[in-house]
Swiss-Prot record:
Induction pattern: Expressed in the early phase of the viral replicative cycle.
Protein's name according to its UniProt entry: Protein OPG064
Organism per entry: Monkeypox virus
InterPro entries registered for this protein in UniProt: Poxvirus_E2, Poxvirus_E2/O1
Residue intervals passing through the bilayer: none
Highest rank taxon of the organism: Viruses
Family under the similarity heading: Belongs to the orthopoxvirus OPG064 family.
Keywords: Acetylation, Disulfide bond, Early protein
Modified residue annotations for N-acetylmethionine: M1
Function: Plays a role in intracellular enveloped virus (IEV) transport to the cell surface on microtubules. Together with protein OPG056, forms a complex that interacts with host KLC2 (kinesin light chain isoform 2) to engage the kinesin-1 complex and thereby promote IEV trafficking.
Originating gene: OPG064
């Protein structure tokens, strides 16, 4: 349990109405300790500024922009890849950032700064060369474009749009463009020419051709606004738009129809009532299912005919359509119809729209995985919800007032997330708790210290261990005396580094000292310094020609190196996947969407990061919003690596899949020096891996896309292995003390 004793004391002693207010009364040391683990209000008191600068500078965004000094800001954001949380601070200190003349820093900050014409002139003076200017300006934001008079060149526009497609909107509003350029952008990028530069080239045929390319209602409305009214009254244009409305593109033409099609209501048919009040008696029409689907969004225009529409829906068993208009048909909904809507409709309906909140309806909602089950609390007690297997604690619940209505719901939340700083921060500092609810929350947490509320299951889950453990113990790397009596041959290779402090060089030397590695591709390493360059000479290892054996031994090496505090980041295979971040934020995670490479490549020293630098390295590699701990980063590396070697290894394996999986697990444990044997069956994992193998072998792609939850069993296995790793590491450490 997160310790809230000091916060509770401050809350009671100072008669605070909010937990945020109580946080401001904490002693600086206590406050900084909580800030370090991500447990803090949206803003923190100025008195903490110096401590934050010293201990957690990446949290400077918690102060208002005027409080943060430009030097502290620049020093901090220079080291971070993701600076989204500093958006307001970056714009506030725009001039200080531009004056640095640091191109990479300016590029990083451009999306957040409101750039003026004077700023552009300054940038042009600082950076000579068209390519540099185009590159920097490509990161400009729409707010800047709306406020400046600077005219972008066509090349600059293309560069900007290549980076952010939707920047076409402010740019097209900003300046008149050549018609040929507009046509090219339409053909190449599908960008509607909403610019006065196209007006002279428009005719009815061109208007229709452009409308055929429109994919956003806003673009259609804005384009028709610039077209000459005489052309909009052409019959060919009218006929095309009427047919487009019949195809369901109603939002695209609402202003146009009201201005130009008042005399064509019969041609509009059932859709006429959306634009003109009760224009058509729809009881005289043969209404199709497609038409019902189209008008369901606009049912407020058909209230006169709601009984007629409901009769058609029920006669034809159109449950999906009934669900889409549920707020207009409350009087006809029985318990049976509510259950049918819940079970048969493609999209979930809001529980608040179901007029009957019976236990049976609730059970059906639970089975269909509804996220707003909490709304049944208006009729059903929380114990019944839990007994039936409901989880009322979801993202949706934050949008309601239920936490202030039910103390039992807060208690349930604490049982689920009381160990998780991120999730408790959301409820305590970001949700508008009443004073009474805040008091209950703090009392419950303070009176249930330790792990009392999380026994027996939660404490052995990976999310719990990620939040409650803070380190992995590393084995000391043995000293290896440098061998200077090596005879070099023509087959020797040389690597050069800029200093002895180079991270890749330090990793290389440490790797060379670790005994028992099987596949690391360098042996007989020696190095010397020459003209400020570090030259490393080595003999390449002999290749292992059996692919399956190479993969297994390589995983052994990765695990063995991890046991000595050198971790492999498999970003070449998984460029975006960080399951640990989801877990420490209390969110569900799924398998990666894509594996970038289907061949397991050789290992290189620069891919291994020392444990003490791992949090920063992983956070920057994946451009995370905040820096995760070294411990959390290590688990992310192990879980990602194991997943990759299971998936890609099984694709390359010629063994029976079950034998391969068990062998991989055994090797992984041996590499980490863990004396564990996983007792769980792996048949479900094998089924998933075989499907991936079949799909990969039937194509010739160098990568593979994965469907959501396609590897759920495999991920569960990887989680269990990580749990065993953490528990063994901590137990081994205790035993050795």
């Amino acid at each position: 349990m997160i310790s809230v004793t000091d916060i509770r004391r401050a809350f009671l002693d100072n008669e605070c109405h909010t937990i945020t207010k109580a946080f401001g009364y904490l002693h600086e040391d206590k406050a900084i300790a909580l800030i370090k683990i991500g447990f803090h209000p949206t803003y923190i008191p100025k008195v903490l500024y110096n401590n934050v600068v010293e201990f957690v500078p990446e949290k400077l965004y918690l102060f208002k922009p005027r409080t943060v000094s430009p030097l502290d800001l620049i020093s901090t954001i220079t080291k971070l890849k993701n600076v989204d949380k500093f958006a307001a601070h970056i714009n506030y200190h725009k001039n200080s950032i531009l004056i640095t003349g640091d191109k990479s820093l300016i590029v990083k900050c451009m999306p957040y700064m409101i750039i003026s014409d004077d700023d552009i002139r300054f940038i042009r003076e600082q950076f000579v060369g068209t390519n540099s200017i185009e590159y920097i300006l490509s990161f400009i934001n729409k707010e800047s474009v709306y406020r400046m008079s600077y005219q972008f060149s066509e090349n600059e526009i293309v560069t900007i749009i290549n980076r952010d497609h939707f920047m076409y909107e402010p740019i097209y509003e900003h300046q008149v463009l050549d018609s040929d350029f507009l046509k090219t952008m339409l053909d190449r990028y599908g960008i509607v020419p909403i610019n006065s530069g196209i007006i002279d080239d428009l005719c009815p045929e061109a208007i229709i051709e452009i409308l055929m390319a429109v994919v956003r209602p806003r673009d259609a409305i804005r384009f028709l606004d610039i077209v000459n009214k005489n052309q909009l009254t052409e019959n060919s244009v009218k006929n095309y738009i009427i047919n487009d409305i019949r195809r369901g593109k109603i939002d695209y033409y609402i202003p146009y129809v009201e201005d130009f099609l008042e005399d064509r209501t019969e041609d509009l048919g059932i859709y006429a009532n959306i634009f003109f009040e009760d224009a058509i008696d729809i009881t005289k029409l043969d209404i199709t299912k497609t038409e019902l689907e189209h008008i369901s969004k606009y049912m407020n225009y058909y209230t006169t005919y709601i009984d007629h529409i409901v009769n058609i829906i029920l006669q034809n068993n159109y449950i999906d359509i009934l669900a889409s208009i549920i707020d207009y048909v409350q009087d006809v909904l029985t318990e049976e119809l509510c259950i049918r809507i819940v079970c048969e409709s493609t999209n979930p309906v809001p529980v608040t729209s179901l007029p009957i909140h019976s236990t049976l309806v609730m059970v059906m909602c639970i089975q269909m995985k509804y996220v707003d089950i909490v709304e049944f609390l208006d009729e059903i007690d929380i114990d019944t919800l839990i007994e039936k297997g409901a989880d009322p604690i979801t993202e949706y619940t934050f949008t309601t007032r239920w936490y202030n209505k039910h103390n039992d719901l807060i208690t349930l939340y604490i049982k689920k997330y009381g160990f998780c700083p991120m999730m408790m921060k959301r409820l305590m500092f970001e949700y508008p708790l009443t004073k009474e609810a805040s008091d209950h929350l703090l009392k419950t947490m303070d009176e249930n210290r330790g792990a009392i509320m999380f026994f027996p299951r939660t404490i052995y889950t990976l999310p719990y261990l990620l939040c409650c453990n803070y380190k992995l113990i590393q084995k000391p790397i043995p000293f290896k005396e440098e061998n200077r009596n090596i005879e070099y041959k023509k087959t020797n290779r040389v690597l050069c580094f800029d200093s002895l402090e180079n991270a890749a060089f330090k990793s290389l030397i440490k790797i060379d000292s670790i005994p028992g590695l099987k596949t690391y591709n360098m042996k007989d390493i020696t190095y010397e310094k020459s003209n400020d360059i570090i030259c490393v000479r080595f003999i390449p290892q002999d290749s292992i020609h059996n692919e399956e054996r190479r993969i297994k031994l390589q995983l052994f090496d990765i695990a063995r190196l991890a046991s000595y505090g050198l971790y492999y980041i498999p970003s070449r295979y998984l460029s975006l996947w960080t399951p640990v971040v989801n877990m420490i934020e209390g969110r569900e995670y799924t398998n990666p969407q894509k594996i970038e490479c289907l061949v397991i490549l050789d290992l290189f020293s620069e891919e291994f990061i020392e444990y003490q630098n791992l949090g920063n390295a992983v956070s920057n590699k994946y451009e995370l919003e905040y820096t995760i701990s070294n411990y959390q980063a290590a688990i992310n590396c192990l879980m990602s690596t194991l997943l990759i070697y299971l998936v890609l290894g099984s694709i390359r394996s010629i063994s029976r899949t079950e034998d391969f999986v068990l062998s991989i697990l055994n090797i992984f444990y041996k590499g980490l020096k863990i004396n564990e044997l996983l007792s769980e069956p792996v048949s479900g994992v094998c089924i998933e891996l075989d499907k991936i193998k079949d799909r990969a072998s039937s194509g010739d792609s160098s990568f593979i896309f994965l469907k959501k939850n396609e590897l759920s069993k495999t991920l569960s296995l990887c989680e269990k292995v990580c749990v065993e790793t953490i528990l063994d590491n901590n137990q081994s450490f205790k035993s050795s003390k």
